[in-house]
From Swiss-Prot:
Record family assignment: Belongs to the 2S seed storage albumins family.
Function: This is a 2S seed storage protein.
Disulfide bond in keyword set: yes
Protein name: 2S seed storage protein 3
InterPro entries per record: Bifun_inhib/LTP/seed_sf (IPR036312), Bifunc_inhib/LTP/seed_store (IPR016140), Napin/2SS/CON (IPR000617)
CDD domains given in the database record: AAI_SS
Signal peptide: 1-21
SMART domains: AAI (SM00499)
A Pfam family that the UniProt record links to this protein: Tryp_alpha_amyl
Subunit details: The mature protein consists of a small and a large chain linked by disulfide bonds. Interacts with AHK2.
GO molecular function: nutrient reservoir activity; protein histidine kinase binding
Length: 164
């Protein structure tokens, strides 16, 4: 009986050690990849943003959403007031194509940079800037980029003080 109990305990201990070692190995490999990569994730996303011509179609789409008073949650079927529905759809499709060319890890950071660029271009107030960020937040969902979903950044703008 003692031998069986010892065998069960030894098996459990071995399983625990193997599990612990594989978790440690995975973490170490991940950290080594980041350490050996001279360009960190932030710089890589910044570079992608610049190479993708600053997500021009997405910036134009966000700007139009803000001017039309739309926040988040639009769909590919939305109509645009001052353009025909087909032209608005094409602009959104171009934006989605730009986003699909990004690495999944860079989609939200580059969208945030694009939203900031749109906010700064027109010198919009806090309300309009909030709408721009809100539109950007939902673009991965609208474009059905499944690896990303919704961007986690806030729809409040850090360079505008909150109202109390």
């Amino acid at each position: 009986m003692a031998n069986k109990l010892f065998l069960v305990c030894a098996t459990l201990a071995l399983c625990f050690l193997l599990t612990n070692a594989s978790i440690y190995r995975t973490v170490v490999e991940f950290e080594e990849d980041d350490a050996s990569n001279p360009v960190g994730p932030r710089q890589r996303c910044q570079k992608e943003f610049q190479q993708s011509q600053h997500l021009r179609a997405c910036q134009r789409w966000m700007s139009k959403q803000m001017r039309q008073g739309r926040g988040g949650g639009p769909s590919l079927d939305d109509e645009f007031d001052f353009e025909g529905p087909q032209q608005g759809y094409q602009l959104l499709q171009q934006c989605c194509n730009e986003l699909r060319q990004e690495e999944p890890v860079c989609v939200c950071p580059t969208l945030k940079q694009a939203a900031r660029a749109v906010s700064l271009q027109g010198q919009h107030g806090p309300f309009q800037s909030r709408k721009i960020y809100q539109s950007a937040k939902y673009l991965p969902n609208i474009c059905k980029i499944q690896q990303v979903g919704e961007c986690p950044f806030q729809t409040t703008i850090p360079f505008f003080p909150p109202y109390y």
